[in-house]
Swiss-Prot record:
<comment type="pathway">
    <text>Cofactor biosynthesis; ubiquinone biosynthesis.</text>
</comment>
<keyword id="KW-0460">Magnesium</keyword>
<protein>
    <recommendedName>
        <fullName>4-hydroxybenzoate octaprenyltransferase</fullName>
        <ecNumber>2.5.1.39</ecNumber>
    </recommendedName>
</protein>
<feature type="transmembrane region" description="Helical">
    <location>
        <begin position="93"/>
        <end position="113"/>
    </location>
</feature>
<dbReference type="GO" id="GO:0005886">
    <property type="term" value="C:plasma membrane"/>
</dbReference>
<keyword id="KW-0997">Cell inner membrane</keyword>
<dbReference type="InterPro" id="IPR039653">
    <property type="entry name" value="Prenyltransferase"/>
</dbReference>
<keyword id="KW-1133">Transmembrane helix</keyword>
<feature type="transmembrane region" description="Helical">
    <location>
        <begin position="14"/>
        <end position="34"/>
    </location>
</feature>
<feature type="transmembrane region" description="Helical">
    <location>
        <begin position="166"/>
        <end position="186"/>
    </location>
</feature>
<dbReference type="InterPro" id="IPR000537">
    <property type="entry name" value="UbiA_prenyltransferase"/>
</dbReference>
<keyword id="KW-0831">Ubiquinone biosynthesis</keyword>
<dbReference type="InterPro" id="IPR030470">
    <property type="entry name" value="UbiA_prenylTrfase_CS"/>
</dbReference>
<feature type="transmembrane region" description="Helical">
    <location>
        <begin position="262"/>
        <end position="282"/>
    </location>
</feature>
<comment type="similarity">
    <text>Belongs to the UbiA prenyltransferase family.</text>
</comment>
<comment type="function">
    <text>Catalyzes the prenylation of para-hydroxybenzoate (PHB) with an all-trans polyprenyl group. Mediates the second step in the final reaction sequence of ubiquinone-8 (UQ-8) biosynthesis, which is the condensation of the polyisoprenoid side chain with PHB, generating the first membrane-bound Q intermediate 3-octaprenyl-4-hydroxybenzoate.</text>
</comment>
<feature type="transmembrane region" description="Helical">
    <location>
        <begin position="233"/>
        <end position="253"/>
    </location>
</feature>
Length: 284
């Protein structure tokens, strides 16, 4: 029974919270900006639960669809479905339960547009695992998926979708592409052998340069957000300077394209999102 529980925990990546935070941070950025400070506790709690469910659901459906691929990749060869600790049919049921909870959370807001947006991102989440078999930039679609909560926040808070909305969306999408490229650098050799496509393979020898350009773009758009929202100097100190320092550190880590260090670079992005959030919180 214990081993079964561990299998489901690993399937939903409860033991690996970085992915949860990477989805949560942009949601919190939007919540604080739309509320000009601390949002309603119930609204905040509902968004956190929704993010938890959607992140875990994404991991489950990814493992379900990528079962044949995971058997061939060093990093994923011990995943629950691959080793048999969770059956594929069971994984599908877990996915449906998580999606049901997430949809119930959205329905609590009593906003039909938010429900519609949630159904769109659900569709994208199901399609995403297949994309790496056909296109070299699935990271772009992942960026859109991970930025979608920003649109839902603005909808739920009855705020007009404005310049800041799209700047947040764009900054986060670019950020996701760069950090998932760092993640793809970990699996590059395996992906090449089994015919899986990724941005790391697309960018090839200029991967570090492209990541650097994307880092600069992310910082620049954050700077523009600060100007548009008339945020104080504390935002620039934490969000802009803090993120920039971590981006420089990531360049150091990925310099030799060492698998382990590329993974460290990816994981450090949780702190990037946190610093941006802290800067926004201290601004109100």
């Amino acid at each position: 029974m214990y081993k079964r529980c561990i299998g489901f925990i690993k399937l939903m990546r409860v033991h690996q919270p970085v992915g949860f935070f990477l989805l949560l941070w942009p949601t919190l950025w939007a919540l604080w900006i739309t509320n000009r400070g601390i949002p309603d506790f119930i609204v905040l709690s509902l968004f956190i639960v929704g993010v938890m469910c959607m992140r875990s659901a994404g991991c489950v459906i990814n493992d379900y669809i990528d079962y044949d691929i995971d058997m061939c990749v060093q990093r994923t060869i011990r995943r629950p479905i691959v080793i048999g600790s969770v059956k594929k049919q069971e994984a599908l049921w877990v996915f449906f339960i998580l999606i049901l909870i997430a949809l119930i959370v959205v329905c609590v807001f009593n906003n039909i547009i938010a429900v519609f947006l949630s159904l769109i991102v659900l569709g994208l989440s199901i399609i995403y695992p297949y994309l790496k078999r056909y296109i070299y930039l699935p990271q772009l679609v992942l960026g859109i998926i991970f930025s979608w909560s920003i649109l839902i926040v603005y909808t739920v808070m009855n705020c007009a979708v404005n310049k800041t909305t799209w700047l947040l969306f764009l900054a986060n999408t670019i950020w996701v592409v760069l950090y998932d490229t760092e993640y793809a650098m970990v699996d590059r050799d395996d992906d090449k052998c089994i015919g899986i496509k990724s941005s790391a393979l697309l960018f090839g020898k200029i991967d570090k340069i492209v990541i650097g350009i994307l880092q600069l773009l992310t910082v620049f758009i954050l700077y523009i957000i600060g100007i548009v929202e008339q945020l104080p100097i504390i935002f620039y100190l934490f969000s802009i300077v803090g993120a920039s320092i971590l981006f420089i550190w990531q360049q150091v880590l990925i310099f030799n394209r060492n698998r382990e260090k590329c993974l460290w670079a990816f994981l450090s992005n949780s702190y990037v999102g946190m610093l941006i959030f802290v800067g926004i919180v201290l601004s109100f």
